[in-house]
Amino acid sequence: MKTLFVLFILILCVFAINANQQEEINQESTQQTHQNLLYKVQKWRTSLKDSSDAELKLSPALVVAGVLCFTAALISSASGIGDGFFFIPIMNLVAGIDLKAASSFSAFMVTGGSIANLINNHFGCKKLIDYDLALLLEPCMLLGVSVGVICNKVFPEWLITGLFVVFLMWSSMETCENGHTSWKLSLILREKEDMRDSRLAEVKRRRTIIFFKHLYLKIKKTETKQSFLGRNLGIISIKPCSVEYWILLSLQIPLALVFTILALSRTESLQEQSISNQEGTRLDHQFKRLMFPVMSFLAGLLGGIFGIGGGMIISPLLLRAGIPPQVTAATTSFMVFFSATMSGVQYLLLGMQNTEAAYVFSVICFFASTLGLVFAQKVVPHFRRASIIVFLVGTMMYLTTIVMASFGILVFYIDNDAGKDIGFQLPC
């Protein structure tokens, strides 16, 4: 009996030793895999440092990035959500271009899509664009973008990534909510159309197309200015971060204030007779008018920090302020065209590299956006399910959020483990 007991104890000891050895082997294997992953990511990040200065050559990765950008522009234009969120991740993760170079490429691609949007919106819906509101919002919005770009240089990368992920998650929720609203409205409109004659149904259908098109069309496309304070010299003689540069940058403050005050005065004088003489209504109207520059500055500030523009930010704020959805979307699209165009010109002035490739991507996104708009006008109303595309874009934004969050956490761990400075930095 004692012999069996001793033998049983020995067998348990052998199993315990084998289990411990196997656990150690698994831990070593997991640690080795983790180190290999970190090494590959670090090697990839190192290879991106000089990509903005190197000349881009035609490669499979660049072709895949072009196809993905074309698809993103087409789907986003068809849904009316916009595609500014997808360009930078595609160019950074697929084409292997660093974030600053990807931002400059995104500016040109947004410009191409904005041209298609302007042709479709401006010439077809002139009465929906509130030019006084655009003049009121644009100066403070551009000023906010300039301040946001400086914050982008000062803030650490992990903070910008975290803020961007939070904002992207909020935008995804807004997109899905808009898709749900579009779904319910399409059902209601479908029931009403069945009860009317064919002529009234056709009129209602066209109005519905215009409503959804201007409610969701490219309200977040605008300039991305992350390389505004770059080190390279452009075709201008003023060096970035020099005394002349800061003086020129500071001049935006009085100019923005002057144009905003003039726009406020003009708007008040034009609408003075249309406002009720009641004091409460007058004060409420003045409060909303004063809030518009503040909201546009906030939109430009966040847009400059994230490098994706402020269209997606200013549009919900205008809707909450009581501006009709059609006027909000059309006016924002009108503002975005000039902002995106100016952004591309500024990148050229600051010595942007690989301009030929940026032109090609801009043309690609122009045709993709045009096809997306045609699809939204001709195909989507036939099936009466525009909300499906909106849900699709919302899902894509959720996936982009997960990828950006995972990559940001991994990069933060690598930089912290390597002992790099992860705090705030000087703008120059």
Swiss-Prot record:
UniProt KW keywords: Membrane, Transmembrane, Transmembrane helix, Transport
Subcellular location field: Membrane
Segments passing through the bilayer: 1-21, 61-81, 82-102, 105-125, 128-148, 149-169, 245-265, 294-314, 332-352, 356-376, 388-408
Name of the protein in its database record: Sulfite exporter TauE/SafE family protein 6
InterPro entries referenced in this protein's UniProt entry, alphabetically: TM_pro_TauE-like (IPR002781)
Disulfide bridges in this chain: none
Record-stated family: Belongs to the 4-toluene sulfonate uptake permease (TSUP) (TC 2.A.102) family.
Membrane topology, record value: Multi-pass membrane protein
GO BP, one annotated term: protein ubiquitination
Family matches, as PANTHER family: CEREBLON, SULFITE EXPORTER TAUE_SAFE FAMILY PROTEIN 5-RELATED
Upper lineage: Eukaryota, Viridiplantae, Streptophyta, Embryophyta, Tracheophyta
Gene Ontology CC entries for this record: Cul4A-RING E3 ubiquitin ligase complex; membrane
Domain of life: Eukaryota
